[in-house]
Amino acid sequence: MEISNDDLRDKTAAMKQQAFAVKAPLTIVFVFDTNVIPAISGRNPIVMEWVKLYTGFAAQNVYLACASMGLGTCARGSFKHDDLAPVLKLAEGKVVTLCMPVGVPED
């Protein structure tokens, strides 16, 4: 995986009401690789439900880690899918499932 210094935060904020996502210094992007399950690769509805479930498990750990460090986060499923995948240079078969901006809470 190639790490970029490009600022891609605007690609993770789908709506103006989600301006906090653009302000966050870090966004964790969860990606599912459909190629790891060759027999059922693609966007099989049952597989995608399991992917969402396991993404949720991982996201819960991010919530707990952030809370323990005094940081804030929020799981976001609404983002610009069509804009985000190309700028992340995702290979064929990789699907973004969730974005979690992380930062210091304003409150």
Residue ranges and their predicted role:
Residues 1-107:
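Acidic, surface-exposed loops and disordered segments
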